[in-house]
């Protein structure tokens, strides 16, 4: 229902904030032309069948693994804070950690879900409180970052607000990942992108790699994926800085392996 509500909304789905756009208006007018109720029910039925199909596929895979003697259990947690949760997990309980940390200067992920939250009955005060919990906008304790690249970039940032944003991002993300890494027995797969500060891409993948290799992990590879399609609109100039807008052209998958007792 939320997905359909977005489709029938005047909000531009390609922007990170609420805004009414000519493109969205044309989309809604096209949907409303003719029997829009039948169109709505048809789209709803399609979405329901998609969910049921995925659920059936998942249950079939789980049943097959159980028949093969490989008991599978999944624990799903929602609405949790990673920074807090990272301190509550048991040691060495996972074989792998696969995650995509938030981007630096993501400008509030909550913006993408703000309209949905309003529809679900959340107040503006509650939504504003959620936005303040996001990295790198929340206050987090400083933690050691074992990376020369991190220190070099840190020394080059003169603006206090950007320096605080930069520090909070790595203190929050690497602080949580470092604690979580202690629970991983084999490998970590970290998907990151080189977001920019003042139009300069920050080599976040390199900082992550240097930090974890200093902690004893082996860097097996960094895979690079070119971003072909984008959801968000692109502007020639960044309105916040007045500089040329630089969107990430690639994303990086950093693969790290825990060394054995022989250091291999």
Range-by-range predicted roles:
Residues 255-257:
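Short, well-ordered beta-strand micro-motif
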Residues 127-131, 186-193:
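Conserved beta-strand signature within the Rossmann-like core of class I S-adenosyl-L-methionine
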Residues 171-186:
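A short glycine-rich, Lys/Arg-flanked "PGG" loop and its adjoining helix->strand segment in the class I
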Residues 162-171, 192-206:
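Acceptor-substrate binding/catalytic loop of class I
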Residues 175-178, 203-215:
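Short alpha-helix
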